[in-house]
Structures are given as structure tokens and as C-alpha cells.
């Protein structure tokens, strides 16, 4: 399971509420230009806050033009560029996202959220090595961030560096005991390694934390069926798909980092009729 991109926008939106008022222009600038510059920046920050509010209500299409205009009116505010970049990332416009995020990083190189967002942009484009470097850089600035640790684990996972991935997932869990996506992804690795009992244990832990999480429930169903507990597996499968029908789509499962062995077993399992 990869992290959902919209979380980045939401976190940025929350941070924008605390943005300071626009600073006054330098004293040497003519008075009229002072007022105009300050007023434009103030309008830009106001637009950014409107965009942030729209993001909280998932109204991304309305937020984007406001964020874009905000960067023109307040071009020296790194949070405004981060908001614009995260909105482009939400829309899968990766080129525009990276351009905006790079501008944000230029203005504030010490913001780990920018590096995490750049990692997500590279990860979505399958530039996994670049994503890994972004996540590592972000974690140097914010070492105990569970989402950042999880993302780095996913980068290691897709690069088939399983021990490193498990280490990052375990660190994420250490920061947040209820962070079931990291527990789930350890299960994905164990299944690919042929450790079905170990995978079952992890998916059971994930389901115990959130019994409405369709992904670990379906994965657990597959593993139980393969192990021989066919009736229970089929019951769990039906429950998982009632929660989220998308998990019946193998392409969707692949996007959620399910490996070759698990995908093969799931394909057969989904064809079984009760």
C-alpha cells in the first residue's frame, strides 16, 4: 500500500493557516511601490488560505487556480509553492509538481515536507531511486516521521531491497503502533519470501487495528485460502470486496505494491465461486 497523495495536500493546507502576514517592503523602495507590493502579497496569502480551505474539503479543482495565482502574488513564500506543487501532484501533473516543489525548496531548503512531496512525485513516475534519495533527505530533517519512514520503506520494497524495507516499516510502526499500512506491507514482503504464516500474522495484526481496511483483509483471505482454510478465506474475500470493490482489480493491487506471488494466487482466488 503506497501513501495517498492527498495527505500531502491536507498537511500543507493545515500549515497554511499559520502563515504570517505579508512583510512590508524595504524602506528604500518608493512609498507607492511599497503599498502595492505589500497589498499584492497579502492578497496572495489570502488566496493561498482559500485554496487550503478548499483542499480540506477535497475541492482540488477549485483550489488549483487560487494556488497558482497565489504564487504569482506571493512568489517568495515557500509554503504557497508547496501547496501548488502538492495540488499538481494530486492531479498527476508531475512535471508541474516538481517545478513548483523545486521552487519551494529553493526558498526553504530545510522543509522536509517538500522533500517528501518530491519523493512522492518521483515515486509516482517510477523514478524509485530518485524517490529514495528524496525520502532519505527528508528524514534527515524529520527523522521520526512515520509517513516518511513508510514511504522510504515502499521505495526499498519496489527496488526489491526487502530487509531495508522491513527495517523502515518497523521504524514507522515504532513511531505509531496503529500504523497498519506499514504492518500490511511487511506482510506483502513475507508472502513474496514464501513465509505465509508470517504474512498471515502481519495481516491479522493490521485487521485487528482497522477491521474496515479492505487491503489486509483481502490479503489475509488469499493467504488463508492458500494455506487450506478455504471457507474462511472466501468469507473474508467477500467482506473485503464489500468494503472496497477496487481490490478485485489486479492492476489496482499492483499499484498497491502487491508482489508477483501474491498477485498470481489472488488472480486464481478471485475466480473461485462460492
Regions found by a protein language model. Name each.
Residues 44, 78-79, 112-113, 146-147, ...:
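Helix-start (N-cap) detector for alpha-helical repeat units in TPR-like alpha-solenoids
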Residues 26-40, 232-274:
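Terminal, low-structured helical/coil segments at or just beyond the last alpha-helical repeat
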Amino acid at each position: 500500500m503506497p501513501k495517498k497523495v492527498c495527505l500531502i495536500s491536507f498537511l500543507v493546507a493545515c500549515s497554511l493557516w499559520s502563515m504570517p502576514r505579508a512583510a512590508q517592503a524595504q524602506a528604500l523602495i518608493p512609498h507607492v511601490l511599497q503599498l502595492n507590493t505589500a497589498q499584492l502579497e497579502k492578497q496572495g496569502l489570502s488566496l493561498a488560505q482559500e485554496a487550503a480551505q478548499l483542499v480540506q474539503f477535497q475541492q482540488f479543482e477549485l483550489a488549483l487556480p487560487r494556488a497558482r495565482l497565489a504564487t504569482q502574488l506571493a512568489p517568495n513564500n515557500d509554503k504557497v509553492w508547496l501547496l501548488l506543487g502538492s495540488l499538481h501532484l494530486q492531479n498527476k501533473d508531475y512535471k508541474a509538481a516538481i517545478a513548483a516543489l523545486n521552487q519551494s525548496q529553493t526558498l526553504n531548503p530545510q522543509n522536509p515536507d517538500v522533500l517528501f512531496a518530491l519523493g512522492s512525485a518521483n515515486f509516482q513516475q517510477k523514478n524509485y531511486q530518485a524517490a529514495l534519495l528524496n525520502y532519505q533527505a527528508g528524514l534527515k530533517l524529520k527523522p521520526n516521521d512515520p509517513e516518511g519512514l513508510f514511504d522510504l520503506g515502499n521505495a526499498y520494497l519496489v527496488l526489491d531491497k526487502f530487509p531495508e524495507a522491513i527495517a523502515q516499516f518497523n521504524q514507522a510502526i515504532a513511531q505509531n503502533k496503529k500504523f497498519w499500512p506499514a504492518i500490511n506491507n511487511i506482510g506483502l514482503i513475507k508472502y513474496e519470501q514464501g513465509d505465509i504464516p508470517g504474512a498471515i500474522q502481519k495481516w491479522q495484526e493490521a485487521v485487528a487495528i482497522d477491521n474496515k481496511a479492505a487491503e489486509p483483509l483481502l490479503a489475509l483471505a488469499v493467504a488463508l485460502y492458500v494455506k487450506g482454510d478455504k471457507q474462511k478465506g472466501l468469507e473474508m474475500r467477500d467482506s473485503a470486496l464489500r468494503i472496497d470493490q477496487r481490490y478485485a482489480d489486479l492492476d489496482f493491487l499492483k499499484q498497491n505494491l502487491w508482489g508477483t506471488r501474491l498477485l498470481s494466487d489472488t488472480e486464481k482466488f478471485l475466480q473461485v465461486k462460492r
